[in-house]
């Protein structure tokens, strides 16, 4: 289990509908539930549910950051006309019982109004935005992920089927960028591909899901 997930769960009890955990942590929880050996992951990737976000959640999250005493605090903002989003990354807690890294992604600007003394460092969005978070700027992927999520053992995580869609898309996008000569880590590309098959093995033969056309097309490309 990801280090600090129990602390995270206790801290955000009552706020489960304000966020969804995606990425490796969500995969790990599903793998443990299906008696698979989870691959190691040290970060918690979170998307904020804009429609359910409250000032109370923002205040609670800041308390979490202060309690952990994260030494590295980064923020990236994209104010372009097509995609507007904010991305936060908190790393290296002084209290090592907390998660090593927590990443927050919001499709709207200005939702997380941390205090002026938060000491958050601006970073280039294009450099640091995670592959899964970037995909969630797409309405179809965002809405499908939110709709196909559940509260599991006190934390809100993406379901198996939505993780498969996200991982397929990440694999496709990263592979295309690498073919164009852009710098992409082959290990990360391979990781997404392997995750798809690990997750698919957890689906029952009777499981059927209706996908938006764009997601269906990406699954077929994969």
Predicted feature residues:
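Compositionally biased terminal segments of proteins
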Residues: 1-222
